Structures are given as structure tokens and as C-alpha cells.
Amino acid sequence: MLEDLRLYQLISPSLPVGSFTYSQGLEWAIEKGWVTNVTELKHWLSNQLMDSLATLELPVLAKLTQLLQQEEWQQAQEWCDFIIANRETKELRLEERQRGLAFSMLLPKLGIELNQTTLPMVKQTQVAAFALAANHWNLTPTKLAAAYAWGWLENAVIVGIKLVPLGQSAGQQLLLEMADVIPQAVEKSQHWPEHLIGSFTPAQVLASSRHESQYTRLFRS
């Protein structure tokens, strides 16, 4: 049970890592009329979940967890570099690094020590932070992947509630419906071939690149 509680803490929206400050392009998509209601938001998020998280973040998270446990530092660093290379806009790269930097300051306070090898990895990507925490707290790969996906989803729905806008009840209903997709994404990630690891979300990439110069915005760029 304690391991599960640690996992809940790791994905909590109250965690001071700035997850709620970025929209990952959704703010621009909403302004331009791509996403105008809860149905379109569900479609937008489902595509990201199945074509990015399930095929990029979650497979890399599993690999990093194993490699860091085995102290295969060079291979682990290569996968951290790979994550950054797949952040296709300046905004997405900045978000990844800023969350990683926040985790680099937070993990030691949670009892997870970082050394001269692991510290640069965590500063580079939050995925490395989750992998280190998983090893420290003996979290199972399936639970870790599901929790990572849930944390991403909850933050994305918060963005939708603020910007579409949606009511709080509609947001909770969307979370309930989208939760059914998370097990599918986790299973897909566990069987995804290594040579195909990557993301294919061109609409999100375009929206993120345009959000960088959006005149009025609530979320960081």
C-alpha cells in the first residue's frame, strides 16, 4: 500500500513541478476553433494518448526504469536524449527541461538521492525522474505507466476546463471516460517495437509552434 501512496504523491497536481502551467499546444487549438467542446477535446486527448504517450513516453519510461536500475548509464542517457529529440517545438523542449529541473530539486527532498550521473538526466527530462522514483519505491512497471498517463491526462483536462471552457462536472465526466483508454495505452506501450518508438501528433506540434507566438495566452510558452 505504501508504494501506491508514493505513486499518488508523484502524480499529484499539487506537486511543485509546474505541470499545470503548460497547455502543450491546446490553448492555441482552442483559440483557433480546433477544439470547441468536450467531444472534440476527448478526440484531441485520445490521439495524444495513443499516438504519443503510448508510443514514446511510456516505452521510454519502461526502458529508463530498467536501465537505471542496472546502472547502464550510457544507454539511459541516450534515451533521455531521444525524449528531447522528439519534443518537436521549442515550447515542448522547454517544458520538458523545466519540469525536469523542478524534479531535480524535489526528488532529494523525497529521499531520492541524485548523483553526478543521474542529476543531468533528471534535469533533461521528467521521464528520468519518474524512472528513478519507480526504482526507489519499487513501483511495478504497469502501475507506473498508468500513473504517468493519468497525471498527464488530469493536467490536460484541467487546461480544457479553463479554456474551452468546460464545467467542473463535464471535466470529471471526461476524466471518467478517458480513464478507460489508459489501460489500452499502457498495453500498447508494453508491446510497442523499439524501432518504432516515437510520436506522431502533427496537429499538436503545429499548435505548439503557433502557441509560442500567440498574442494572448494563459499558459507558458
UniProtKB/Swiss-Prot annotation:
Keyword Chaperone: yes
InterPro entries per UniProt: UreF, UreF_sf
One Pfam family it belongs to: UreF
One annotated GO molecular function: nickel cation binding
GO cellular component terms attached to this protein's record: cytoplasm
Subcellular localization(s) per the UniProt record: Cytoplasm
Record key words, sorted: Chaperone, Cytoplasm, Nickel insertion
Top-rank taxon, per record: Bacteria
Family in the record: Belongs to the UreF family.
HAMAP family registered for this protein in UniProt: UreF
Function: Required for maturation of urease via the functional incorporation of the urease nickel metallocenter.
PANTHER family: UREASE ACCESSORY PROTEIN F
Subunit (UniProt): UreD, UreF and UreG form a complex that acts as a GTP-hydrolysis-dependent molecular chaperone, activating the urease apoprotein by helping to assemble the nickel containing metallocenter of UreC. The UreE protein probably delivers the nickel.
Name of the protein this chain belongs to: Urease accessory protein UreF
Record organism: Aliivibrio fischeri (strain MJ11) (Vibrio fischeri)
